[in-house]
């Protein structure tokens, strides 16, 4: 048995280098198109999946659908697991390093290499 782990495609926030955790945004159109083009190669690598397991986030569901479309893989069970959702970035959610520049809490986070987690997050 093979286990294939795939990160979701790009969202607008990812392209802007934002901390995208609990913000539930869709993939960009360009990312969806790229995933659809890669789908055949990925399916050749993995074969018919025994199951498709994702987080309930839009970006993950859209990635799974682009790679393993339900109309082709009707018989494959799909599971959404809340525990696979991205972490909570707290006060840093949907901000990028430029927006956080000069923020004392952000600098502390960087200086401690995140050892204490995100303020008001995980």
Language model features with spans:
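Short coil-to-beta-strand
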Residues: 1-10, 102-108
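Active-site-proximal alpha-helix that buttresses catalytic centers in soluble enzyme cores
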Residues: 3, 7-73
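Phosphate-handling substructures
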Residues: 71-122
């Amino acid at each position: 048995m093979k286990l294939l782990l795939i990160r979701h495609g790009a969202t607008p926030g990812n392209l802007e280098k934002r901390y995208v955790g609990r913000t539930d945004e869709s993939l960009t159109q360009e990312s969806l198109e790229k995933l659809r083009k890669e789908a055949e190669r990925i399916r050749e690598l993995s074969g018919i999946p025994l199951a498709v397991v994702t987080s309930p986030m839009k970006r993950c569901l859209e990635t799974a659908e682009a790679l393993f479309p339900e109309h082709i893989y009707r018989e494959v069970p799909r599971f959404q697991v809340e525990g696979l959702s991205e972490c909570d970035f707290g006060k840093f959610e949907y901000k990028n390093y430029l927006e956080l520049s000069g923020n004392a809490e952000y600098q502390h986070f960087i200086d401690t290499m995140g050892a204490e987690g995100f303020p008001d997050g995980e």
